Structure formats: C-alpha cells, structure tokens
C-alpha cells in the first residue's frame, strides 16, 4: 500500500458499523486500521494495510500475518461515493451476518479469481497433508496452520485472468492494419 495506490481516506476519523469502530489512519508512511472498543474507546487491535485490491468502484484493504497470509479486512472505500462501507453491505448475505463474515484469507480465496496467474503457494503443504492423513485438522485444529508464499503474474483482474495468456494475441495485433481489417470486416479475432 503506497500513496499512489491507496484511494481511501485514512484521516483518523472513526467509522462504526455493526457495533465495531475502526479508525483508518496514516503513520510513518504506512496505512493502518485501529479497532476500537466503542464503549471504552480503548484500542483493541491495530492492523497494518500492506496491499490494496481495486481502483475503480471500490478499494479493499489487506493486512498480512506472520504466516504470509493476506487478510481482506472488513471495511472498504467506495471510490465514487468517497466513503467507508462495511463488506457486509457489498456482498450478498443475511442482514444479521457477523461483523467479520466477509473477512477472508486472500491467498486461498480472492487470489484465484481476482488476479492473473495466481499461485496460492502453501509453502508447508507436505506437512499439512501428512497431518491430514494422520487425522489432524489444519487451521485451528490439532494440526499445523497453513503458511503461504503466494505469487501472481499480475495483481488485479486483467485479460489473462479469464482468457489465459495473451502473448499470441498481443503479438498479432501489434500491426494496426490487422486490427483495422478485423474491425471493418467484422471478422472475429481467432487469437
């Protein structure tokens, strides 16, 4: 998350939804969410924003934990309306969903559809699979937790996210005459 990529208003003004108060702010060049107890005004937790997702309609914010997992946080910035919105108001679900019902691990969920060339990169898969074989349960059970070394070819939804690598298409369409010919004849581009 950089000043060039962050679109949200991190001005320290608290935002309260579903009985939870979050204070988005900047400090020492970084971006943070403080989770505040609305009854006592005491800070419960601080999450550093390390990655952004989205730049057109709304922007989501991710923090990272020691195991390499990126976590999608509960509040997003609505770019057109210039306001904070809770994730429960954006994703379909019951009105009584818990505050954190749309918080997610980006490495295993969001990465697959919202990026080009995703590799979730569970770095300790052998350990996890051996634990499962012996009856252990990962993620909060008796077994080891997932550790991530995720990568993508390109962050965000690009042509290749749905259509696959586009090198042949790009190479053939460098020639503007070919593009005009296809446009004016109405012929489909086979690449």
Where does each model-flagged region fall?
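Active-site-surrounding "flap" and adjacent substrate/cofactor-binding loops of secreted or lumenal enzymes
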Residues: 2-12
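A conserved amphipathic helix/loop scaffold
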Residues: 16-18
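Extended surface/linker regions that mediate inter-domain or inter-protein docking
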Residues: 21-191
């Amino acid at each position: 998350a950089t000043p060039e990529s962050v679109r949200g208003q991190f001005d320290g003004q608290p935002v309260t939804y579903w009985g939870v108060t979050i204070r988005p702010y900047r400090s020492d060049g970084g971006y943070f969410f403080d989770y505040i107890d609305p009854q006592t005004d005491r800070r419960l937790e601080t999450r550093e924003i390390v990655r952004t997702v989205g730049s057109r309609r709304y922007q989501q914010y991710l923090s990272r934990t020691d195991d390499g997992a990126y976590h999608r946080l509960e509040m997003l910035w609505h770019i057109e309306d210039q306001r904070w919105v809770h994730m429960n108001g954006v994703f379909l679900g019951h009105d009584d969903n818990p505050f954190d019902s749309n918080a997610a691990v980006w490495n295993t969920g969001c990465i697959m559809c919202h990026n080009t060339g995703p590799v979730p990169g569970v770095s300790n898969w052998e350990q996890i699979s051996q634990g499962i074989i012996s009856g252990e349960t990962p993620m909060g059970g008796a077994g080891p937790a997932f550790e991530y070394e995720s990568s993508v070819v390109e962050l965000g939804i690009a042509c290749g996210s749905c259509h696959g690598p586009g090198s042949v298409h790009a190479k053939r369409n460098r020639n503007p005459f070919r593009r005009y010919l296809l446009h004016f004849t109405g012929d489909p581009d086979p690449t």
